[in-house]
Every structure is written in C-alpha cells, then in structure tokens.
Amino acid sequence: MIKKAEQFLDLDDLMIPCIVFNGPEDQLPDVFANLNQGGTKLSKYQVLAAQWSHHSITLPDSENGNKLLEKVIDRYQKLIDERDLEIDGFDAQEMYESHQINLSEFCFAIGELIVEASEVFWGDLFTQDLSKKEDTINVVGYVSTAIALGVDNRSLGKLPDKLSLFRTEGFIDSLVKNMLHEYKVIQATFEQRLKLPGQASKRKYETACIADMQALSFFAELWHKHYVVNLSLIHI
C-alpha cells in the first residue's frame, strides 16, 4: 500500500495539518466532541477512556475488588467474542494476577454493578444491544463516581485528581460498599411504586418515566446527605 502511494506523492514531504490545544487537559473531551461533529462520533466517555489509560488503580483482593475486576475482564471478553476485536495489551491472566485496572475501567465496572443493583431503573438494559448497554453503564458509572468523589458532572476530566484516594488502604472497598448500599436503598424505595401489575409481562417495572440523570440525582441527594469523602476514608 505504501509503495502504491509513493507512485502518486512523496510521503516524506507530505504536509499533514494538525490542531494544537494548549488549554486544560480536563477540557479535551469537549474539544474533541466539537471537532468530531462531522465524523463518526465518540462519546465523551470513550474519549476519557483513551485519555485515562495510564491512570492505574490496584484493586483489593476482596469481594468488591474481585467483582470490579471480573466486570472489566468480562467486558473485554465480550468485545472480543461478539465483535471479533483484538484488544491491545489485554491479558486476562495478567489482570487477575496484578489486580490492576485504570480509572476508566473502574467507572465502567462500578456502573455495571450499580445497574444490576437498580433493576427498577435499568432492568430492561440487559435485553438491549451491547453498544446501548455500554453507553448507559458508562453514564451511570462515571457520573456516580464523580458524585461520590465530589466532582462536578460537567468536569469529569478532573476525576484523575482524586486518584490518591484510591491508593488509601480500605478506600475502594468502603467506596463501592457505600455506593451500592445507597442504590439498593433507592431500589427498595421505588420498587413497589414502579412495579407493573401482572406476571405475564417481561418488563417488571415502569422505567420510561424516570430518565438516567433523574435516577442519578436521587443517588446524589442521598450520598451528600450521608457521606463526606476525604483523603483518609469515607465518613458517614
């Protein structure tokens, strides 16, 4: 292919235009989204995933740590099996041994644990295609993590500033346990109110009346009422 191209142009002298962005790093997802309006669109979560690939987190060898790790590995295995993709650098055995994931993978994994615990809002999600499912899980995971760590949803690019919290012993277990607890409280509160009558329907709950961000706002209200996150632990 390169030899054919060289018959028509000199690749050594080819001028390739580029745009240099000198602003804050946390604004890159918005900048990229604006530049990419005419092409194949990537969500801001896909942009953040690429941007955060080097922000590593070591998960504890605990029930919650292992659940997060399984979600990350399972996601990649499904992408390989369902889309016939090759994922650069993915080695399931190596991940099991190191217990290392990155910040973006944490957000996805906690998002999937949350939607599984919140059937009243996202019970229909697992009947949808992989792309739609991943989009919703990303929204839930990234925004919930931002809420828990005191980062404005409009400034998700600042989440890496909180990485030092994840290196504090016991923090990840405490964070995951308390996040899931609040979502289970919300699930119990809305379960009877949104339950559809009859047993014949495949849908258990009337989910159309509550948008994703509305459900996330319920979590934000409870979280800020019950918890304060600092560099040492989560205070209740």
Model regions and ranges:
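Serine/threonine-rich low-complexity intrinsically disordered regions
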Residues: 10-12, 62, 102, 129-132, ...
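C-terminal solvent-exposed extensions
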Residues: 119-160
